[in-house]
Amino acid sequence: MEIAVEREEENYLELRIQGEDHTLGNLIAGRLRSVKGVILATYYLPHPLKDELVIKIKTDGTISPREALNRAIEDVKVLGESFLDELEQV
């Protein structure tokens, strides 16, 4: 996985991630939408034959896009740990 910042402003961040597809894009964008202060969280695949995605994050200014991304990633980590705990009990 390679990550490049395509565009960054005070309330906007656009990342290009090589080697990933809808799986990561949908997971991260979905979690970003639940972070307070995020007003836009989306992703797209620039080309269907390339493993590459672009994530766009826009905030209302109460949180930076990078902080929102960090919170979303932490949420995903907690979700994964919770899933593994539940799976062990089955």
Curated annotation (Swiss-Prot):
Higher taxonomy: Archaea, Thermoproteota, Thermoprotei, Sulfolobales, Sulfolobaceae
Alphabetized InterPro entries for the sequence: RBP11-like (IPR036603), RBP11-like_dimer (IPR009025), RNA_pol_Rpb11_13-16kDa_CS (IPR008193), Rpo11-like (IPR022905)
Main location, first listed in the record: cytoplasm
NCBIfam families: PRK01146.1-1
UniProt EC number: 2.7.7.6
One Pfam family from the record: RNA_pol_L_2
GO cellular component, one term: DNA-directed RNA polymerase complex
Keyword vocabulary terms for this entry: Cytoplasm, DNA-directed RNA polymerase, Nucleotidyltransferase, Transcription, Transferase
UniProt organism field: Metallosphaera sedula (strain ATCC 51363 / DSM 5348 / JCM 9185 / NBRC 15509 / TH2)
The reaction(s) this protein catalyses: RNA(n) + a ribonucleoside 5'-triphosphate = RNA(n+1) + diphosphate
Nucleotidyltransferase found in the keyword field: yes
Membership in a protein family: Belongs to the archaeal Rpo11/eukaryotic RPB11/RPC19 RNA polymerase subunit family.
Subunit details: Part of the RNA polymerase complex.
Main function: DNA-dependent RNA polymerase (RNAP) catalyzes the transcription of DNA into RNA using the four ribonucleoside triphosphates as substrates.
BP terms from Gene Ontology: DNA-templated transcription
Gene3D superfamilies in the record: RNA polymerase, RBP11-like subunit
Subcellular location as annotated: Cytoplasm
Coiled coil: none
Annotated signal peptide: none
UniProt keyword annotation of Cytoplasm present: yes
Transmembrane segments: none
Name this protein carries in UniProt: DNA-directed RNA polymerase subunit Rpo11
A GO molecular function held by the record: DNA-directed RNA polymerase activity
